[in-house]
Amino acid sequence: MALFGSLDSMPLEELLLVLKSKEGALEIWNVKGLPATTLYLKPGRIRSIDQRGKPLPPEAAKAVLLTLLKAREGSFEFLPNLRPRHRVRLNWPTEKALLSLV
């Protein structure tokens, strides 16, 4: 299931709930103050958050996720079945991550 759109029509928290049973890469760009960001997802989990092709450490990933959750401008595309090329994993439960940051 390929999915694309803008954060003004579907905020990230809604988007993550729609995608909670999917595996793939959620690419987000045109968010003020952030470079293009990729969230790698697997069912029920945020596997990794990457910028410029590199995984972010947990504290930086939390800050970026919080900024993305607040963003109401930006574009996204979900690419199913893509996995990160690196072995760094956050492996955060999606709903727990949303509840702890919102």
Model-identified regions with their sequence ranges:
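Acidic, Ser/Thr/Pro-enriched low-complexity segments and adjacent helix/loop capping patches
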Residues: 1-102
